[in-house]
Amino acid sequence: MAITVNTNVSALIAQRHLGSASEMLNQSLERLASGKRINSAKDDAAGLQISNRLESQMRGLDVAVRNANDGISIMQTAEGAMQETTSLLQRMRDLSLQSANGANSKADRQALQEEMGALNDELNRIAETTSFGGRKLLNGSFGQSSFQIGASSGEAVQVSLKNMRSDSLDMGGFSYVAAGMADSQWRVTQDNRQLTMSYTDAKGKQHNIQIQAKVGDDIEELATYINGQTDKVSASVNDKGQLQLFMAGKETSGTIDFKGSLANQLQMNVTGYEAVDTLDITEVGGAQRAVAVIDTAMQYVDSHRSELGALQNRFNHAINNLDNVHENLASSNSRIKDTDYAKETTQMVKQQILQQVSTSILAQAKKQPNLALALLR
């Protein structure tokens, strides 16, 4: 091996290894201090891209969970108010049944009507004041809203809140009253027992309800028989002996067309659309119709509560899934970006030893030019 003075190759080699060991040691110290394996793109360019995409997805999942929880809170608020609406309707139904009792005087029915009015006002107050974050929920203004419950576009669920005011069209239906008045002697005869009710539903489909009344039934028995044959209409009799029929507004897009021999005898006429806010129980006939109207309103409210309950369960399951996906993404991101302390401390000790060795060797290499002086003596 040549002995030179101008170029100390051994020292240069030792210096290079010392620099490499120092660089690797600094990298290990940075990873241990930050807790991250990737601190800049030079550490792992591909891994950094993947990690950033995973973190973006996880942030989106966090927002989606908050959105779903907001949706649940809105539905819980609305459903709680509708529970009280159901209680009010139950009480109004009780008052209607009580007013239909023949033992009540006109003054008694007027007192019951006053309570009906107060309950109706409270029902509307609940519908108008129930809100979430300043947004009205049950007065018909909420309509339909989209809740983003996913980390990407297009992962939204539509939630609609219906109008719970007592004057809502869904809170009532069409009432019909027979022009003919049946006295105590009136009976269904063999020649007058056919009653066909034709109507078109909200989807445009034609329906026919065919009733073949029992010969010998009086008007009250006829109403009971009709109620037993179909659940689409509700039949009752007023204090004048007139048959009354009621069909919920959601069942039909128009009025009922009556046909048949019994229909011709009774001469059923539509009296108009009747909702909860127009109920009058000061007469037996009105009290009887009120029961049918309130039953329709209760079915409407309960049906919407069921829809909201199903959506709440859906949102809860969505949150569970989002949490599970977030957990798996976090685990994957950790494997890519986070520091493995067991591995990195081993690497640090290794580089520290190499640094010390390289420093020692560099010191020895620097002494080699002194050999030239020994040759010159």
Swiss-Prot record:
Domain of life: Bacteria
Sorted UniProt keywords: Bacterial flagellum, Coiled coil, Secreted, Virulence
Coiled-coil annotated spans: 97-130, 300-337
Single GO term (MF): structural molecule activity
Cellular-component GO terms for this entry: bacterial-type flagellum; extracellular region
Main location: secreted
Family matches, as Gene3D superfamilies: 3.30.70.2120, f41 fragment of flagellin, N-terminal domain, Flagellar export chaperone, C-terminal domain
Compartment(s) of residence: Secreted; Bacterial flagellum
Protein family per UniProt: Belongs to the bacterial flagellin family.
Quaternary organization: Heteromer of multiple flagellin subunits including FlaA, FlaB, FlaC, FlaD and possibly FlaE.
Known function: Flagellin is the subunit protein which polymerizes to form the filaments of bacterial flagella. FlaE is not essential for flagellar synthesis and motility. May have a role in virulence unrelated to motility.
Name used for this protein in its record: Probable flagellin E
